[in-house]
């Protein structure tokens, strides 16, 4: 029986590392009846964390998508279908969070009642603002030492600049935490410890909390009154609002991102999660509540698709995963129309057709095969060939490109070498698959050393990649230290003679050239000019001279790094009828270039990165001081809602370990991005140290 669209909820559960997000998701699956034994994260058995690395590290890396059904704590609703995307909270995996927010309609943000609004939560909040995702908040871990519900509420106001509306107050805190008060019903809720909170009862509000409850209920009424003129009139005349009126008003205000309803509880102690599920149904949007999806057609004109089964099919692929049993899985969100297995769809970003074979609905890591996917749903397709993250799948005759997701460039690189010859080919396949899954991870072969270089978003990111390579593909690899790619260039023009002569009985070797070597402007590259007149060196030998010069340039002249941006003119020389050969002239060219380059003031160039740091104002001085210590040149500053933005140019060599240092200097509240800017001459003392190493 297909669920009507208005009964769908596509939500994400997002939070900072350790706020208890995975435990919350586990409880959701338990109460909605999808999982019969509660998986605890600290046992390494949580259903949503299905990669071995996640269970070992106790953090969530891949966002698994899960479907469950809920009809309310009091069975007061029709059965709603909730699709949940679990998102990671570690900064090296921000990309996963961004991907999942893109395809959600709403989110539950989990905060730790002790730690409050942590840096990562600020980042998640900013991303949710960027995509306009309505959200409700669950203040978790109310049973922990130092739990302080109202402090978290004030941080949501101050740090995140949002308008929280408190719908529940805790009864007690720390080990005294008993349950919650529903401020709309004005009843206390006690969950039954015996059956893990499956049953509960409403009781009267404890006398000592009555006054506080009245005060917070008044805030709810005040917020609800903003919804319509009728309610405002009722409010001004001092009339009571009905429960239905309050909920309708709050639903509208939440979906339009004007308020954020706040719930509290302890997922671990089985208190409060069912009320959050009710909140998902009551306050978060169904696919029909969100604006029509926008895109462009093949001519680049803007078009809209309604969330309806009657529209042409369109969907966005938001995650590619390799599954040990079925191969490549493409997770996608259907925005319009209906897709049946066996259909052919068009990947409008790549311009390729794809036939849809099996369609799966995922429950954490068990799967159910389905015949069709309808608008508003989230599912996975098996074995698509051309699709990567952010691609659009659509009807062949009604082409649409939904917006692309932008992914940052990787900032750190390390060399990986297979431990054995047998691992060589396997490693190539494994890295290719992992790069397809994760757009923020890249692989290339260094032409100079022949090494395989992997690049990613941070040191943890690459550790996990190497770890997955070992576990999922059985490839053992040695990992090098993070590396910087230097270059060399020349600063002065010289003329140089080069001779290569060998006589040892029989045929000798003879090569003789004159080269003019000059610097070019940065980025111009290598240029070779043949200015030989009167055939002093025959035409057929000229390419050999050029080749000799280029080989020497690749090997460098001072530190073994490639020489860039030079112009070489071959203007004179001589040859011997018998002894001259291509080989002899190549060696003459190569030696001549090296001797000349050493006189042409060779210098070392280092890559400079454009770095942008977003930091709360309090840490501004520390951040600037640290950038100066790293030989950074501050280019400018500006204000943003998240604090100050500092832009600087910093040598890549000074940026290793920066994310860790920045996190500790700002208690993790600052974030940064960096990308390649240019090559610039390295200061003498730095260059000397590098040359010595060689």
UniProtKB/Swiss-Prot annotation:
Q: Which GO terms describe its biological process?
A: ribosome disassembly
What InterPro entries is this protein classified in? EFG_II, EFG_III, EFG_III/V, EFG_IV, EFG_V, EFG_V-like, EFTu-like_2, G_TR_CS
Localization of this protein:
Cytoplasm
Give the top-rank taxon of the lineage listed in the UniProt record for this protein: Bacteria
GO MF, one term, reads: GTPase activity
Any single Gene Ontology cellular-component annotation: cytoplasm
- Which residues are listed for GTP binding in this entry? 15-22, 86-90, 140-143
Where in this chain does the record put each tr-type G domain?
A: 6-288
Keywords attached to this Swiss-Prot or TrEMBL record, sorted alphabetically, are:
Cytoplasm, Elongation factor, GTP-binding, Nucleotide-binding, Protein biosynthesis
**PANTHER family in UniProt:** RIBOSOME-RELEASING FACTOR 2, MITOCHONDRIAL, TRANSLATION ELONGATION FACTOR G-RELATED
Outline what the protein does: Catalyzes the GTP-dependent ribosomal translocation step during translation elongation. During this step, the ribosome changes from the pre-translocational (PRE) to the post-translocational (POST) state as the newly formed A-site-bound peptidyl-tRNA and P-site-bound deacylated tRNA move to the P and E sites, respectively. Catalyzes the coordinated movement of the two tRNA molecules, the mRNA and conformational changes in the ribosome.
Q: Which family does it belong to?
A: Belongs to the TRAFAC class translation factor GTPase superfamily. Classic translation factor GTPase family. EF-G/EF-2 subfamily.
Q: What's the name of the protein?
A: Elongation factor G
Q: What is the organism field in this record?
A: Legionella pneumophila (strain Corby)
Q: What is the lineage of its organism?
A: Bacteria, Pseudomonadati, Pseudomonadota, Gammaproteobacteria, Legionellales
Q: Which gene encodes it?
A: fusA
């Amino acid at each position: 029986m297909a669920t009507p669209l208005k009964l769908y909820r596509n939500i994400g559960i997002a939070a900072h590392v350790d706020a208890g997000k995975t435990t919350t998701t586990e409880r959701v699956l338990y109460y909605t009846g999808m999982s019969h034994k509660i998986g605890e994260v600290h046992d390494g058995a949580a259903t949503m964390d299905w990669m071995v690395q996640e269970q070992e590290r106790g953090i969530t890396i891949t966002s698994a998508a899960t479907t469950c059904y809920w009809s309310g704590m009091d069975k007061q609703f029709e059965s709603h279908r909730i699709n949940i995307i679990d998102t990671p909270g570690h900064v090296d995996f921000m990309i996963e969070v961004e991907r999942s927010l893109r395809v959600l309609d709403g989110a539950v943000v989990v905060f730790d009642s002790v730690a409050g609004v942590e840096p990562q939560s600020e980042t998640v909040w900013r991303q949710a603002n960027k995509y306009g995702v309505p959200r409700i908040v669950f203040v978790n871990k109310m049973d922990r030492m130092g739990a302080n519900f109202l402090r978290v509420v004030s941080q949501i106001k101050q740090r995140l600049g949002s308008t929280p509306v408190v719908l529940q107050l805790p009864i007690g805190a720390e080990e005294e935490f008993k349950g919650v008060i529903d401020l709309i019903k004005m009843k206390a809720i006690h969950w039954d410890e015996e059956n893990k909170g499956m049953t509960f009862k409403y009781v009267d509000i404890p006398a000592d909390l009555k006054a506080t409850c009245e005060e917070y209920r008044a805030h709810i009424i005040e917020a609800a009154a903003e919804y319509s003129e009728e309610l405002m009139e009722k409010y001004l005349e001092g009339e009571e609002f009905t429960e239905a009126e309050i909920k309708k008003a709050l639903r509208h205000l939440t979906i339009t991102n004007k308020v954020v309803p706040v719930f509290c509880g302890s997922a671990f102690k089985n208190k409060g999660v069912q009320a959050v599920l009710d909140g998902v149904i009551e306050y978060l949007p169904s696919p029909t509540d969100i604006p029509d999806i926008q895109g462009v057609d093949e001519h680049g004109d803007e078009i809209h698709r309604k969330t309806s089964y009657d529209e042409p099919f369109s969907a966005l692929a938001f995650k590619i995963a390799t599954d040990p049993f079925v191969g490549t899985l493409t997770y996608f969100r259907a925005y319009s129309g209906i897709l049946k297995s066996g259909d052919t769809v068009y990947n409008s970003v790549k311009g390729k057709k794809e036939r849809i074979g099996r369609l799966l609905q995922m429950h954490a890591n068990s799967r159910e095969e389905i015949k069709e996917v309808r608008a508003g749903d989230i599912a996975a397709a098996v074995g698509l060939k051309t699709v990567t993250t952010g691609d659009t799948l659509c009807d062949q005759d009604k082409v649409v490109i939904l917006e692309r997701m932008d992914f940052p460039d990787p900032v750190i690189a390390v060399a990986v070498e297979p431990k054995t010859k047998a691992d060589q080919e396997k490693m190539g396949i494994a890295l290719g698959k992992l790069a397809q899954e994760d757009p923020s991870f890249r692989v290339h072969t260094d032409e100079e050393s022949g090494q395989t270089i992997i690049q990613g978003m941070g040191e943890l990111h690459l550790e996990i990649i190497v770890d997955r390579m070992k576990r999922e593909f059985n490839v053992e690899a040695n990992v090098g230290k993070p590396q910087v790619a230097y270059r060399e260039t020349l600063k002065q023009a010289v003329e140089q003679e080069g001779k290569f002569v060998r006589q040892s009985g029989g045929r000798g070797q003879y090569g003789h050239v004159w080269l003019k070597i000059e610097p070019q402007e940065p980025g111009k590259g290598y240029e070779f000019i043949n200015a030989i007149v009167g055939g002093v060196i025959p035409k057929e030998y000229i390419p050999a001279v050029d080749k000799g010069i280029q080989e020497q340039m690749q090997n460098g002249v001072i530190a073994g790094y490639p020489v860039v941006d030079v112009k070489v003119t071959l203007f004179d020389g001589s040859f011997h009828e018998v002894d001259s050969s291509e080989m002899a002239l190549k060696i003459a060219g190569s030696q001549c270039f090296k001797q000349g380059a050493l006189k042409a003031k060779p210098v070392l160039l280092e890559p400079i990165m454009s770095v942008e740091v977003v930091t709360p104002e309090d840490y501004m001085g520390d951040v600037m001081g640290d950038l100066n210590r790293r030989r950074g040149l501050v280019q400018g500053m500006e204000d943003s809602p998240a604090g100050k933005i500092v832009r600087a140019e910093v040598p890549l060599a000074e940026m290793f370990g920066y994310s860790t240092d920045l996190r500790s200097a700002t208690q993790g509240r600052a974030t940064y991005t960096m990308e390649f800017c240019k090559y610039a001459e390295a200061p003498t003392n730095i260059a000397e140290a590098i040359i010595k190493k060689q």
